[in-house]
Amino acid sequence: MHINEETDWIDLVKPALAKKPKKIVDNSDKFPTPRGFQQKSLVSKNIHSGNSASSTSIFAKREEELQKDLLLKKAWELAYSPLKQIPMNAILAYMSGNSLQIFSIMTTLMLLVNPLKAITSTGSAFTPFKGTHPGTLWPAMGAYILFQLLLMGIGVYKLQRMGLLPTTTSDWLAWEVSKVFMDRSYGPSKTVL
């Protein structure tokens, strides 16, 4: 049979589809559990004793713990996401130059505004992970804010390198107090001949 020939191929596949799956046999009692693995022995004892309700609750608790751990892991992945952006943004800030051009100014504004938006929406960014253990999201949220502040630091450094931050005394001349002289001399000097 060639693949391009028009045949009723479903008749060829029907016997394979009609087979029922084999019965699943649990052979886990034949093998010893790994060292330090206690959950299996508790579950197998409950199943053999006929206490299926307690084994179901053990499975449900374990499943809930695994779900919370997975949510916490995903929360930390979200917290580390700004850290992965730091090298790219640092290279972009370096490559845009220090002269006052539209591209370098827009890059610098992006480095200041985007982390500020992310910091203000930290609570909404972490709402999918609220089902984790109580109090375990605070370190992840703190790390997220810290990494966003590092991104803002790159933007502030770029502003300073471009000369847009008032860091010298000549930038503050309007608030400088003029020097008060104790003595003044007026008039032309007299020369004696």
Curated annotation (Swiss-Prot):
PANTHER family assigned to the protein according to its UniProt record, in alphabetical order: ER MEMBRANE PROTEIN COMPLEX SUBUNIT 4 (PTHR19315)
Localization in the cell: Endoplasmic reticulum membrane
Transmembrane segments: 91-111, 137-157
A GO-annotated cellular component: EMC complex
Similarity remark: Belongs to the EMC4 family.
Keyword Transit peptide included in the entry's annotation: no
Pfam families linked: EMC4
Membrane-protein topology: Multi-pass membrane protein
InterPro entries: TMEM85/Emc4
Protein name: ER membrane protein complex subunit 4
